[in-house]
């Protein structure tokens, strides 16, 4: 994987990837099939954020949006990275020297929540079921396991030199 750091450059905190200062603009879309990777690439963007999901349930309690892609851990005991492969292949076809960070929604899949009802959080919202609770030790342990498996996958992926970071998201307060 690529290395990333924040360093002072001309007195300004700057993102460095593989030792090189970067223009700190990134293109992100939830809708990778309709993503305009090539358009943004031609406009000078080299940093791209791709969204992936551990779970398979609503990601927004107010409107019940589902993940816009299959959850990596939606099936118990079987990680499925095929969506990651597809979105990265699509991006690199359009932006061959792209640098990638993944926005990882760490909300648990339904099977985990069904098996761990005492680890869920009732937000008190009307008609909303209890969901994964980031304050739960069991949730954090499961998230660590899933992150470890995802990182091991990324480190061994053919595109690993394009990856420089993760943006952890999700969980329900």
Task: Give residue ranges: language-model regions.
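N-terminal carbohydrate-binding accessory modules
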Residues: 1-42
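Acidic surface patches and DE-rich sequence motifs
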Residues: 16, 121-122, 168
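Structural preference for beta-strand elements that scaffold enzyme active sites
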Residues: 22-26, 46-49, 97-103, 161-167
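Aromatic-lined substrate-binding rim segments of carbohydrate-active enzymes
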Residues: 34-130, 134, 141-142, 148-155
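Short helix-capping segments at alpha-helix termini
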Residues: 157-159
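Active-site-proximal loop/short-helix segments
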Residues: 169-173
């Amino acid at each position: 994987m690529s290395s990333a750091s924040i360093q002072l450059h001309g007195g300004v905190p700057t993102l460095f990837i593989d030792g090189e200062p970067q223009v700190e603009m990134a293109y992100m879309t939830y809708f990778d099939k309709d993503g305009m990777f090539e358009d943004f690439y031609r406009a000078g963007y080299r940093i791209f954020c791709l969204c992936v999901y551990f779970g398979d349930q609503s990601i927004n309690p107010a409107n019940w949006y589902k993940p816009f892609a299959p959850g990596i851990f939606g099936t118990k005991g079987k990680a499925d990275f095929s969506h990651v492969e597809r979105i990265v292949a699509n991006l690199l076809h359009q932006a061959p020297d792209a640098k990638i960070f993944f926005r990882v929604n760490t909300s648990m899949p339904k099977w985990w929540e069904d098996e761990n009802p005492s680890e869920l959080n009732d937000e008190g919202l009307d008609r909303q079921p209890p969901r994964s609770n980031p304050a739960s030790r069991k949730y954090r342990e499961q998230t660590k396991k899933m992150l470890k498996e995802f990182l091991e996958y990324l480190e061994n992926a053919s595109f690993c030199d394009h990856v420089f970071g993760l943006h952890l998201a999700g969980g329900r307060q």
